[in-house]
Amino acid sequence: MAPVSVCAEVYDVAAWGTANPMAVRIAQCTIDVEDLDLMVSFWSAALGYEIERGDDGSAKLWPPGQPSASSPSFWLQGSGTAKRGKNRLHLDLVADGDPQAEVRRLVGLGARHVDVGQSGTEQFTVLADPEGNEFCVLDSAPTR
């Protein structure tokens, strides 16, 4: 089964007429984790990313090829504490193939289904990684 991709939308800001020379870009996604080995294993398998261990107790996950807006790198750093409460920010993933088959694969890797008040008509599935960080698998990539 093909790995999932991280969804990101890239817009031509200049075309909006609001170009800002001081605008920033997302460089990477950073996740504070309690169990570094567990989370590196889960996210590298989920995304199909390569692992680079740091000397400081962290790990960098690199996408095949170069990081991009649709495939950013991930930095996992040990926090020593468990996650508390609902995420204020989460990842939306899109499968290269059948989204429900991808959900089953992710659950097999250690993800679990999460109820955040869905109505049942959503076009996504809410999951949590082994430490409880919520993320979604979209039925299809977002369009503008």
Where are these predicted regions, by residue range?
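Charge-dense, helix-prone N-terminal extensions
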Residues: 45-51, 69, 82-85, 99-119, ...
